[in-house]
Every structure is written in structure tokens, then in C-alpha cells.
Amino acid sequence: MDGVPPGGELDGIRCENVECLTFANESFDLITSTDVFEHVEDDIRGFREIARVLKPGGAFIFTVPLDETSPTLIRGKRAADGSIHHLAPPEYHGDPMRGMTVYTWRTYGIDITDRLAQAGLAARCEFVVTHGVAMRVPVIVAHANR
């Protein structure tokens, strides 16, 4: 959250930067996130932080928008002046906490488990049948490689 330091609170909610978590190594048995990592500028760094704070045998279970027919699409890179250089049409998702939209750095694809492996996480992708907006939701289950 803008203006809140990592580890600080806003309205009773702890705020963290997943690229630089304030938790000690091996702090958690389980970490979950729902449609977050597509908004993380350096997702590999964020995945490494998840691996760092997972206890041995711990699990990271998360969802992201995933195109199972293509490799990950990188939508933009940070330019030297701090602006975003778009490599694909920009995409934004709503942020109910801030009442605004958030840039989507990538749309994950069939190579997501390779991206997690770069960060020291062994992963598999499962598809869960749901009712509502989407009928099949990809759920990624990852474990630290230690």
C-alpha cells in the first residue's frame, strides 16, 4: 500500500511488499495468495521471498490468471526513467482495497512452474472446478526445494 512501510499496518491490515518480506526465514507452514503475482513487478524475486519464509515442507498455494495454451506474456518492463515500457497491450485489474486499478505485469502461461523453479519452488498446477464467474480456476501448489 502506498505510504505504508513493509510490515506496517493500515486499518488493522498488515502491509507487505512480497519482493522484500519483513518476516524471518522459515516462518510459515502455509502461504496463500489470490490473483496477486501478476501485479508484482519482479515476480521471481517475490517467489524467492516466498521460498525463503516457507518452513521445510511448507506449501505456497495461489491463483493467478493463466493461459494454459501459451508461455507467460510479459506485458511491460520498467524504463530507466521509472515509467512502464509496454511490450504488449496494457491490462489493469481492479483493486478493491484502494478503489483503483493496478497494472498487470504479465499473464502467466504454461511455463509458470519453470518460473517458480527459478525461485527454488517445486510446483504443480491443478485446475479446480468452480461455480460462478469462471468454471475452471488454475490453482498452483508449490513447495520449497529444501
What does each of the following model-derived ranges do?
Residues C20, E38, E68:
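Active-site micro-motifs of SAM-dependent methyltransferase domains
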